[in-house]
From Swiss-Prot:
Intervals, Cytoplasmic compartment: 1-33, 86-98, 156-200, 250-460
Source taxonomy: Eukaryota, Metazoa, Chordata, Craniata, Vertebrata
Quaternary data: Heterodimer with SLC30A5; form a functional zinc ion transmembrane transporter.
Protein name in UniProt: Zinc transporter 6
Protein's job: Has probably no intrinsic transporter activity but together with SLC30A5 forms a functional zinc ion:proton antiporter heterodimer, mediating zinc entry into the lumen of organelles along the secretory pathway. As part of that zinc ion:proton antiporter, contributes to zinc ion homeostasis within the early secretory pathway and regulates the activation and folding of enzymes like alkaline phosphatases and enzymes involved in phosphatidylinositol glycan anchor biosynthesis.
Membrane topology (UniProt): Multi-pass membrane protein
Keyword Cell division: no
Compartments where located: Golgi apparatus, trans-Golgi network membrane
Family: Belongs to the cation diffusion facilitator (CDF) transporter (TC 2.A.4) family. SLC30A subfamily.
Keyword terms: Golgi apparatus, Ion transport, Membrane, Transmembrane, Transmembrane helix, Transport, Zinc, Zinc transport
């Protein structure tokens, strides 16, 4: 039978959780303005959809989708306020900033799907063009234009403002920029208005309204109904071209990639860290975008054995914190004691052992209290370190040196040749470990698995 919980906390449903989070956001006065714009947006969308049905205009429908996108942007702004008031939890230790990235990505992808739907409907209308009624066409155009511009310019939407600046320019922005340069070449006084990078949302709102005005005039003058379908295709293409760079940028953030524009700055900071006093090596560095304008990273630093860990950690954090706001640094001390010798089979290509000298390791003091990987005192209950830098481990085969090599002194070496029989009978090893065949040779293969010694026993 399972455990009986007398005072078990009741689990909230999904609707209850959403209601609780919505109340948390609504408690902030700054969100009241967004909620008001959202209510007006829903009313405006309802009227526009009715006018789209009465006019039978697919171009007005495509333009209405931009108003629906404004509703998504307002929801994204609410999520941004929710992220500000929420604190990191054990499940989301980095905070909830990725939720607003996900909201931007979802909004732009939905806008592109709406543009694809308009393209599909327009292709069907080219085969059989219906009659377009212009009664509410111009009214719907100006209502949608006014509300879109009023929403974009009145509400400070931090996520979309950042994405529109950081993402690559759309083809519509590039063409408008070329046209602006030509106009400013004739009238230099307009350079302060046209030359800066235009807001892509304002640009597509104005371009879509201009296309609908041209549609209205051509239908009123010549009853040319096909221009409505052409305008719908143009608005859909502009929508897709405007949203695509933003979805790509937010998608890269979700994939935890490093922004290309910070490569040079990160490389410079890592070079400065590698020159700090006590630092021997910087490796396993990984940096990624946690949210819009927030960079996170982790780095492993190998230091000298006599270096102060806290001092090095403070210097490394101080250097990288100027660019990386969320940083994890792991400090490892240098490992200079080699692991214990282990028995290995004699290679077939070693014909005469008398031509070699076997180096025996000096006696290890307090071998039981040393970690064989990092050679630092470790408690019996402490787990092995996660990483080691350029450390072969316990399973590295011994090395046999030739007679022609220089013999080091003061290490307890046996000078002179060792008979073949004594090598096989006596064996070499660490005191207290038993007599084993402990030759250091570079001819046998080094086991590729870390954590298992050559005796077939797994390391704890």
């Amino acid at each position: 039978m399972g455990t009986i919980h007398l005072f078990r906390k009741s689990q909230r449903s999904l609707v209850g959780k959403l209601t609780h989070e919505f109340r948390l956001v609504a408690a902030d006065r700054r969100s009241w303005k967004i909620l008001l714009f959202g209510a007006i947006n829903l009313i405006c969308i309802g009227f526009l959809l009715m006018w789209c049905s009465s006019t039978n205009s697919i171009a007005l429908t495509a333009y209405t989708y931009l108003t629906i996108f404004d509703l998504f942007s307002l929801i994204t702004c609410l999520i941004s306020y929710w992220v500000m008031v929420k604190k990191p939890s054990p499940v989301y230790s980095f905070g909830f900033e990725r939720f607003e990235v996900l909201a931007v990505f979802a909004s732009t992808v939905l806008a592109q799907l709406g543009a694809l739907f308009i393209l599909k409907e327009s292709a069907e209308r080219f085969l059989e063009q219906p009659e377009i009624h212009t009664g509410r066409l111009l009214v719907g155009t100006f209502v949608a234009l006014f509300f879109n511009l009023f929403t974009m310019l009145s509400v400070r939407n931090k996520p979309f403002a950042y994405v529109s600046e950081a993402a690559s320019t759309s083809w519509l922005q590039e063409h408008v920029a070329d046209l602006s340069r030509s106009i400013c070449g004739i009238i230099p006084g307009l350079s302060s208005i046209f030359l800066p990078r235009m807001n892509p949302f304002v640009l597509i709102d104005i371009a879509g309204a201009l296309a609908l005005c041209i549609t209205y005039m051509l239908i009123e003058i010549n009853n040319y109904y096909a221009v409505d379908t052409a305008s719908a295709i143009a608005i859909a293409l502009m929508t897709f071209g405007t949203m695509y760079p933003m979805s790509v940028y937010s998608g890269k953030v979700l994939l935890q990639t490093t922004p290309p524009h910070v490569f040079g700055q990160l490389d410079k900071l890592l070079r400065e860290v590698s020159t700090l006093d006590g630092v021997l090596e910087v490796r396993n560095e990984h940096f990624w975008t946690l949210g819009f304008g927030t960079l996170a990273g982790s780095v492993h630093v190998r230091i000298r054995r006599d270096a102060n860990e806290q001092m090095v950690l403070a210097h490394v954090t101080n250097r990288l914190y100027t660019l990386v706001s969320t940083l994890t640094v792991q400090i490892f001390k240098d490992d200079w004691i080699r692991p214990t010798l282990s028995s290995v089979p004699i290679a077939n290509n070693m014909l005469n052992l008398s031509d070699h000298h076997v180096i025996t390791m000096p006696s290890l003091k307090a071998a039981d209290n040393l970690n064989p990987v990092t050679s630092t005192p470790a408690k019996p209950s402490s787990p092995p370190p996660e990483f080691s830098f350029n450390t072969p481990g316990k399973n590295v085969n011994p090395v046999i040196l030739l007679n022609t090599q220089t013999r080091p002194y003061g290490l307890g070496l046996n000078h002179g040749s060792t008979p073949y029989s004594s090598v096989l009978n006596q064996g070499f090893g660490i005191p207290g470990m038993g007599a084993t065949q402990g030759f250091r040779t570079g001819f046998t293969n080094v086991p590729s698995r870390y954590g298992t010694n050559t005796r077939g026993q797994s390391r704890p």
